[in-house]
Amino acid sequence: MLESSARWFRRKGVALGSSLLTCLTLASLTGCARSDDQIVIRFYTPASEAGTFSAAAQRCNRELGGRFTILQVSLPKRADEQRLQLARRLTGNDRTLDLMGMDVVWTAEFAEAGWALPLSDDPAGVTEAAAQRDALAGPLESARWKGKLYAAPLSTNTQLLWYRKDLVPEPPATWDQTVREAENFARSEGPSWIALQGKQYEGLVVLFNTLLSSAGGSVLAGDGKTVTLTDTPAHRQATVTALRTMKSIATADGADPSITQTDEGTARLAFEQGKAAFEINWPFVMASMMENAIKGGVPFLRLDRRPDLTGAIGDAGRFAPSEEQFAAAYEAASAALGFAPFPSVVAGQPARVTIGGLNIAVAKTTRCKAQAFEALNCLRSRENQKATAIEGGLPAVDSSLYDDPEFQAKYPAYAIIRDQLANAAVRPASPYYQAISTRVSAVLAPITGIDPERTADLLNDQVQKAVDGRGLIP
């Protein structure tokens, strides 16, 4: 998963006792065996969200009243390493694996491999309907494969346009306008960079997928096999338009000279250091800027001179404000930091922004299917989603939470986030997504070297090879 906003709001989870035993069963039984020992459902999540989901597990444990216990277990921080560890556990039939926090792009692969149980397998018969109730369309679509839900949305994410409000009275609505305004800043020797994710990695694929979807195109058809980058004149035009937009951003006058090596972290720093007038990034940007401004690291936002905010940095050196401090910091930051919808590729048509986030699925290796599904429903309950969003910095997947005043106070951009998630793009749904992503990022890099017509043909060829399972991955 891409750099998460959770790192700016994370709380430590309380570790459960090591004496708890894993859920056991007997080979002759179809259900989950009980003994005097406590049944434990292990929930594997990225290490970067350990505190957030450990806290969610503990809220559920209080609610469960001792019938069984949910234990959060950390996977590595990098998405590719998370996927590899889960795959090894699943192919090795590791019976300690019950619940999986899955990157939204893994659904098709895990479903095809039989690693994730369909939600319709819930013995209680409630999970499939519960996952769809009140769910935003984009996150829900990411949990579906071939018309069936194999996971439930747990958290989500969407990128916004962040801009220097003290320099830009009104945010640009299209990419043409964004590039033009950045070039105007270059001519006046102002901050002219458009900070985004340009190096050869998943972030570059996300950028391309958003621009492609916004232009009316797609990488694959709904069957997960048919490549649709250049198969019709309209699809080819959408692909070329997306590539032309990427090239114009990367080669604009005054563009970031290191754009071929940029990711979420470097984009954030470029903006905070005053080098960028615009930034494409996830909602963690808001808390990051307030934290670093209070520490004196943002030259155009000197919150370090505000004595009422000095206590907003906690003992761990992270942003841990009271409600009053958050409101004060946000009010001050709003003079310099603005947010707006992701710029349109086609004027008058809202961008379709690629979502991030996590889904939660029951692993085929669980010996306690009923308890695992019950745990899944508790972990993504409304109460847990609200706490995960407010305390963990991960946007909620239930649409009604965006009307909650407490949620709105912590997410000033809530209306834009909700609207983009309702009209979101998802990355290509395919069991071969990992190969597709690797090949696409290799073709797109370096972003400054894109030749729209030629690159469109190369992309089509490489994605077709990935789907066909041919050739070495670059």
Per-range role (PLM):
Residues 181-182, 225-260, 342:
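Glycine-centered hinge/linker elements that transmit conformational signals in sensory
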Residues 87-89, 96-98, 128-166, 177, ...:
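A structural signal for short loop-to-beta-strand junctions that line the ligand-binding cleft
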Residues 121-134, 198, 217-241, 294, ...:
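Short, solvent-exposed loop/beta-turn-alpha elements that line the ligand-binding surface or hinge
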Residues 104-158, 176-179, 326, 331-340:
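Hinge/lid segment of periplasmic solute-binding proteins
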Residues 2, 399, 419-474:
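Conserved C-terminal helix/tail region of periplasmic/extracytoplasmic solute-binding proteins
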Residues 251-254, 293-392:
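Extracytoplasmic/periplasmic substrate-recognition and gating elements
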Residues 2-108, 125, 454, 462-474:
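Conserved N-terminal structural module of periplasmic/extracytoplasmic solute-binding proteins
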Residues 334-341, 389-442:
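Long, aromatic- and glycine/proline-rich binding clefts that accommodate carbohydrate-like moieties
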